[in-house]
Amino acid sequence: MRVVRAGIIGLGEVAQIIHLPILESLNTRFQVTAICDISPMLLAAMGERYRIPASARHTDFRDLVARDDVDVVFVLNSTEYHAECAIAACNAGKHVLIEKPIALTIEDASLIASARDKAGVQVMVGYMRRFAPAFVEAVDEVRNLDRIRYVRVRDIIGHNRLIIEQSSNVLYPDDIPQEAVADRQARNREMTDTAIGEDSGATLRRA
């Protein structure tokens, strides 16, 4: 079986808790060959932890998607950047896994789909419960049943922050470049204006 080479964009909480550990546990099937984040601290820490050479640690996602040793790109950064990164990956001929939600607008989601179709690659939104062991086992059990007359699903939505703090050792960066902070703020203001109208008043936009 050929090992799939993965490039990771975004090294925050979901990458540290879910994606990087799982990819490492599946090391006969996947290899993380490159990582990208705007935080030098996270790049250094995750690079050391997962044995990624310095030459494969990037602060610009365009450098990562252009690499020949990346087959699939994991888009795990903040949602307002999903479309830009995913489209660039598709245009570079890479398959893409995007953390949920796929994008903030239907327009951006459609642009991702168009880039996927044009490039002939696969794009998947990472709703992981479909592949969770409990779900897979439940599907197998249901197949063995005769006629199903009643179905009830119970889900416990807990306090995730408490669980994360007690069970994980997540690194949170304190070295995000100021221009990146300003860019994200500008994008969020633009999204708010799009949602409620630019003439709604400054106080309402800030809310």
Residue ranges and their predicted role:
Residues L26-N27, Y50, R67-D68, A132, ...:
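Acidic-histidine catalytic/liganding microenvironments
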Residues Y50-S114:
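Beta-loop-alpha module in the N-terminal Rossmann-like domain of NAD(P)-dependent dehydrogenases
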Residues P173-A207:
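Rossmann-like dinucleotide-binding domain that binds NAD(P)(H)
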Residues M1-I52:
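N-terminal Rossmann-like dinucleotide-binding module
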Residues I17, P40, H58-F61, A83, ...:
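Structural motif corresponding to alpha-helix initiation and N-cap regions
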